Amino acid sequence: MSNDQNMFGQELQKAINEMKIPVTLSPGQKNTFQSFYQDLTETNKVMNLTSITEEKEVILKHFADSIALHLAVPDLDKKPYRIFDMGTGAGFPGIPLAIAYPELRLTLADSLNKRILFIQREAEKTWAEECKCYPWKG
């Protein structure tokens, strides 16, 4: 594991701990979050996914905030919940939830097909089995 990967994972776990979210990410999950961050910022250069792109801000405002659902649903890590993320945008909170809680069954929907295509590519890399992505217009 490179020093950059280690630092990213440490910063992410620190943000989760500071929010008192009862989750300890595995090294593999931390690597997946970093890979998603890299894909997000690269894709954001050609497709408007998010205005938040600085690493520490993404860790706090996208990743840790998404995982904070655990505070409202304390047994989130103990049951195979089904979650529908309508208007997912760049995949928040759905993608971070899927990485942190692989047993969740997620459906992500967004009105822009190009965002759904980005999310589907990410799903194929990591947690495709329990995540479905659909274009949706309300």
Predicted regions and their residues:
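N-terminal auxiliary segments of SAM/dcSAM-dependent transferases
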Residues: 1-54
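Conserved SAM/SAH cofactor-binding pocket of Class I
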Residues: 67-138
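SAM-dependent Rossmann-like transferase core, predominantly class I methyltransferases
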Residues: 49-77
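A generic "alpha-helical surface" signal
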Residues: 31, 57-60, 110
